[in-house]
Amino acid sequence: MRISIFGLGYVGAVCAGCLSARGHDVVGVDISSTKIDLINNGKSPIVEPGLEELLQKGLATGKLRGTTDFAEAIRATDLSMICVGTPSKKNGDLELDYIESVCREIGYVLRDKNTRHTIVVRSTVLPGTVANVVIPILEDCSGKKAGVDFGVAVNPEFLRESTAIKDYDLPPMTVIGEFDKASGDVLQSLYEELDAPIIRKDIAVAEMIKYTCNVWHATKVTFANEIGNIAKAVGVDGREVMDVVCQDKALNLSQYYMRPGFAFGGSCLPKDVRALTYRAGSLDVDAPLLNSLMRSNTSQVQNAFDMVASYDTRKVALLGLSFKAGTDDLRESPLVELAEMLIGKGFDLSIFDSNVEYARVHGANKDYIESKIPHVSSLLNSDFDQVINDSDVIILGNRDERFRSLANKTPEGKRVIDLVGFMTNATTEDGRAEGICW
């Protein structure tokens, strides 16, 4: 494949070396003549183990060259990768000047280019950047239509400095965000030789995946550091603790808790978060990430309330009251908190939860229900159909399987708010179901 790479920093230089070494015809483009001279002399413009050897191989086989001539590079290739920097502004937003400049250069050349060209954004950009910045510039400068006259895609990179060559050759996954199917097909053919799953998504999803991965890595580092600081303060080696924590692949390092949805609750998590952060505070150990957990959890309950309040009705059904399906435990259930907020604001609330209904009459939680939340328990109704029929808005609160069908086939005249992820897609055909995080 004939590929031009714009920006020969850490991402662009590595891509140029790896792609040319795999037999692709690569033109590296940069405004810095110093970088171009280095590339053309087989020298790496960055410090990266193994890269110089790849660049030299590309030069020796005639598969790699560098230039400062943007137009010539675009005319000589079929696919352009944008790898320029997107540094932070003082306010934290991204500086997109380099992206915009490259897009203008590409667009002007495309105006007179008769063959199809695919533009791939590898630079890290926020969701909406390609749709609202990249494509409009390309279309305006070229006078052509994205997805028709030229292709557009996003291909986020997951390269770490000092291990970038290995990361390129052995990626955990290859993410392709495609504006048009043809562009996705082109990129898939480029990466099929790599032993990694190829995941094709919409462009905005791909943009968000990159940020989610990086923020998750930052969160893990911060979490481990805060746990380590607290552990040290109580006389424990935090490394020993985290080593054992990371051995649990069923829960600790798994997909189990990594699903967007409603707040956490129950008798353990809230209590233990409060206890550990209290101990940290008593030892003068700063743990801002851990201290934010309960506040963030409460915010998610508020989000659910706001969704209900956005509808012009007061008749609401809450399906599920315990913090998870299959239990009658109401201790610190976020659904109880949501119910109390709705009651306090005058909503006409009906609640269905077969486990809690049984517990109210027979279970060990009877005293808890009657003494702690009698105002909530009095709204429980064991007639599922009546609860549905008497409501205008239906909240799917836990993963009781009998609630699933309501998410994808909303009853006539009703609205559904899905807190648990029963909806198959982010939207339904009738548009009457809405997810809290989708």
Swiss-Prot record:
Q: Which reaction does it catalyse?
A: GDP-alpha-D-mannose + 2 NAD(+) + H2O = GDP-alpha-D-mannuronate + 2 NADH + 3 H(+)
Recorded GO MF terms: GDP-mannose 6-dehydrogenase activity; NAD binding
Provide an example Pfam family for this protein.
Answer: UDPG_MGDP_dh
Record function comment: Catalyzes the oxidation of guanosine diphospho-D-mannose (GDP-D-mannose) to GDP-D-mannuronic acid, a precursor for alginate polymerization. The alginate layer causes a mucoid phenotype and provides a protective barrier against host immune defenses and antibiotics.
Name of the molecule in the record: GDP-mannose 6-dehydrogenase
Source species: Pseudomonas syringae pv. tomato (strain ATCC BAA-871 / DC3000)
Gene for this protein? algD
The record's annotation in NCBIfam families points to: NDP-sugDHase
Q: Where is the active site?
A: 268
